[in-house]
Regions:
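Intrinsically disordered, low-complexity polar regions and short flexible loop motifs
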Residues: 19-257
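Sec-dependent bacterial lipoprotein signal peptides
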Residues: 1-19
Length: 257
């Protein structure tokens, strides 16, 4: 009888241990920030930077050794690979700080106070032409009204103007390479401003921006694929007086959704 009781007790212990081993475990978690933001280094001639919200670094590049790389986000690039980063709602001072080692490491070269609202999306741009004497660049922020798609045959496209020395408002056009239909994206846009989103049928497009009083392309980009159900921001950057090279005017294509 005692042997049966011992066996029963052992079986019970095994069952309990099995239950405990396979029980659902509650993992520690932290509340995700309620807003999202992208960061772009469009400051012509600016050094590579890391981006900060107040004193918290929100973008950085790792290295093969596991430590932070000093390469940072170079001109024309986006922080965190161009995807959104979580940020807490509230008042923030957003900065781009020099990433390279040396006397100017972590020096803020672009500073912008901003109010971040819960549940909203934003894009922060270093812009204009970097001042090598004062070691400063312009900066601005725009809200990204990201919404779920309602039509998968079209995309929503907008235009952001980050060229400081454009002498007139710029309008972005999208020429469909299949049927030659031209779509105007928003309207004439000033420096540090964004158009609204415009519905554009899915396809391949040649993009170009012109002054409102001209038929000459000031900046262009060909063979851009626009997918239905997506949202895109076309950003103009560069030095309007430069004809070619890395600082010449360029159009950046970034998916918001």
């Amino acid at each position: 009888m005692n042997s049966h009781r011992i066996v029963a007790a052992l079986l019970g212990a095994i069952v309990l241990a099995s239950c405990e081993k396979n029980a659902v475990q509650v993992l520690p978690s932290a509340e995700l920030p309620g807003a999202r933001i992208k960061f772009f280094n469009f400051g012509v001639g600016a050094p590579a930077v890391n981006f900060y919200a107040n004193d918290t670094k929100v973008t950085a590049i790792g290295s093969g050794t596991g430590s932070e790389s000093s390469s940072g986000v170079a001109y024309g690039g986006g922080g965190a690979g161009g995807v959104y980063t979580g940020i807490a709602p509230g008042q923030h001072t957003l900065t781009g700080r020099i990433s390279a080692a040396g006397a100017d490491k972590n020096l803020p070269i672009a500073t912008l106070p901003a109010t971040i609202e819960d549940g909203k999306y934003y894009s922060f741009y270093m812009s204009g032409i970097y001042n090598t004497t004062t070691k400063t660049s312009d900066a601005f922020i725009v809200e990204d009204p990201v919404v779920p798609p309602t039509d998968y045959t079209t995309a929503q496209v907008r235009f952001v103007q980050a060229i400081s020395n454009a002498t007139n408002l710029l309008t972005l056009y999208a020429l469909n390479t299949t049927d030659s239909t031209t779509t105007t994206i928003g309207g004439p846009i000033a420096y540090k401003a964004a158009s609204g989103f415009t519905a554009v049928p899915a396809g391949i497009y040649n993009l170009y921006a012109r002054y409102t009083d001209s038929t000459t392309n000031k900046v262009s980009r060909n063979a851009v694929t626009i997918l239905g159900g997506r949202m895109y921001t076309i950003g103009a950057r560069g030095n309007i007086t430069v004809a070619s090279g890395t600082t010449a005017p360029a159009l950046d294509n970034t998916a918001n959704r």
